[in-house]
């Protein structure tokens, strides 16, 4: 097959795509970060289809009879069953729907084995998966479809209304989980259970993952087939160290790269299985651990803290790895979980732009209060605004590079994220002299009050040490005299009635006085995205309130 001939990106392997939109809209090569493949496990062949690697090769290596996915219905799909379903769906995509290699296919629905099968089918068909969340609304969906020029969608029948409401011109929507001969699953049943994966290049785009877009137009992050394997061959291989008998589960949805990696890519890469829960809050996760013998758990810090109050009624003895990401893991939460369960929570920082976690630590290498060290295969440093490294112990911007990098789809914000060959994530960090990286705040979340720098997460950590506090978020509010003042929003623990003045006195006993919140506001819940990330910007825009009781 001939190369696409995109002059902005010479040196790419000849593409397996017929529709070259994704490759044609990669940033010019000079705007890419430096990509590093300095470990043997990251040396991939030029021709690579990640769907075939994750499914076909794993079935051959570990056995088609091994379990792959478990569903709350009690049904278990083996690798062989999964392969048959995936291959039949791939036949529908290419034989009935006319999907050509390189075309974008939007995937939408709650976390189920069928959604995972659709993703794998898109991979094997050589198309590009556009992963979205079941909770995203019509306007968001319309914008994403416009950016990625989506013309095909596979959608759970329960999640189709907002997609139809989006009114995307020329969009062909095929639903699954319904009734009738036109349902995807009915169509798939009429096709053979074997499909030869399209001969894609390792550097063909496999998926477009959109950032949340909470502060502006969503950014589409384009990732290659080799990138999908690279996150498994770095974080999963070296930090999680999976074995075929592992059972993965977690709260992040498959439309979120944290969930796609933790619940589909990682277990399939290593012959393990995963429990795909449609409802995966703390109340559902805890009983599922004992029921399925879950060994590897992925969820957010807030969930770990919430589960602490319910642990006594559940058996969590099967757990081997507990992973936290999505937001900073407070040391108080880490200590409380460790004391109750004996498990050391694996902290980590990842990004949609880099697909998954790139700084972390496990077992005896964990240091509570730090994120960890660069995962093998990744490199990180702390820099100033000019890109120059800052001395250990001084705060600066986190800069990262490794086998995966930021490549926005036709978006000038590429110039902000990639600087001097490094991915600059927008997080403020300190590197300790022993090489551990310590989170300070999002760069735009630093509070400057009367000339003092205050990191909101540090104040949050102090508040979380108070027994009456379940959750908290600390932001800066504009103030004529001080520039900004520190404001804390607090969700009380169930049954508690904390007093604002006493909380302030408690914080003064933990931190220097200028970091103490001048206002404390009590809320029933903090604003979060569909993936559970805290939306601090919504708190910053709230009008001043009377201090809490």
Task: Report residues per predicted region.
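Conserved AMP-binding A3 loop
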Residues: 78-80, 199, 206-230
């Amino acid at each position: 097959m001939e190369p696409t001939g995109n002059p902005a990106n010479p040196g790419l392997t000849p593409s397996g795509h017929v529709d070259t939109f994704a490759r044609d809209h990669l940033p010019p090569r000079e705007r890419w970060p430096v990509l590093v493949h300095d470990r043997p496990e990251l040396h991939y062949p030029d021709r690579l289809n990640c769907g075939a690697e994750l499914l076909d090769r794993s079935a051959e290596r570990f056995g088609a009879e091994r379990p792959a996915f478990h569903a709350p219905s009690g049904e278990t799909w083996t690798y062989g069953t999964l392969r048959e379903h995936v291959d039949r769906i791939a036949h529908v995509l290419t034989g009935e729907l006319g999907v050509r290699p390189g075309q974008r296919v939007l995937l939408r629905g709650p976390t189920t084995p069928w959604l995972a099968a659709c993703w794998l089918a898109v991979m094997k068909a050589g198309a590009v998966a556009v992963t979205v969340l079941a909770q995203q609304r019509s306007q968001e969906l319309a914008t994403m479809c416009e950016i990625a020029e989506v013309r095909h969608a596979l959608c759970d029948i329960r999640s189709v209304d907002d997609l139809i409401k989006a009114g995307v011109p020329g969009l062909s929507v095929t639903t699954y989980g319904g009734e009738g001969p036109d349902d995807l699953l009915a169509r798939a049943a009429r096709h053979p259970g074997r499909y030869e994966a399209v001969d894609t290049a390792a550097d063909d785009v496999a998926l477009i993952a959109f950032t949340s877009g909470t502060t502006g137009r969503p950014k589409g992050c384009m990732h290659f087939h080799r990138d999908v394997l690279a996150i498994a061959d770095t974080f999963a291989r070296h930090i999680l160290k999976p074995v075929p008998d592992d059972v993965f589960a977690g709260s992040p949805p498959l439309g979120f790269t944290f969930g796609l990696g933790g619940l589909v890519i990682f277990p399939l890469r290593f012959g393990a299985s995963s429990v795909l829960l449609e409802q995966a809050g703390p109340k559902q996760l805890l009983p599922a651990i004992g029921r399925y013998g879950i060994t590897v758990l992925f969820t957010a810090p807030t969930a770990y803290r919430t589960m602490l109050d319910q642990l006594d009624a559940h058996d969590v003895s099967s757990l081997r790895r507990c992973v936290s990401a999505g937001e900073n893991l407070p040391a108080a939460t880490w200590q409380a979980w460790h004391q109750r369960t004996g498990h050391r929570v694996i902290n980590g920082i990842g990004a949609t732009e880099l697909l998954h976690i790139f700084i972390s630590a496990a077992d005896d290498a964990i240091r509570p209060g730090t994120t960890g060290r660069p995962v093998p295969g990744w490199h990180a440093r702390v820099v100033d605004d000019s890109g120059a490294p800052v001395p250990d112990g001084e705060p600066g911007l986190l800069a990262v590079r490794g086998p995966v990098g930021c490549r926005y789809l036709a978006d000038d914000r590429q110039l902000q994220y990639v600087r001097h060959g490094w991915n600059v994530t927008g997080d403020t960090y300190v590197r300790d002299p022993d090489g551990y990286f310590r989170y300070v705040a999002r760069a735009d979340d630093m509070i400057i009050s009367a000339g003092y720098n205050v990191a909101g997460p540090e104040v949050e950590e102090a508040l979380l040490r108070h027994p009456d506090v379940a959750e908290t978020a600390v932001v800066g509010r504009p103030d004529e005299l001080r520039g900004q003042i520190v404001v804390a929003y607090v969700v009380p623990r169930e049954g508690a009635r904390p007093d604002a003045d006493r909380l302030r006195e408690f914080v003064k006993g933990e931190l220097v006085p200028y970091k103490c919140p001048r206002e404390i506001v009590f809320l029933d819940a903090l604003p979060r995205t569909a993936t559970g990330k805290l939306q601090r910007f919504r708190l910053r825009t709230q009008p001043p309130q009377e201090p809490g009781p």
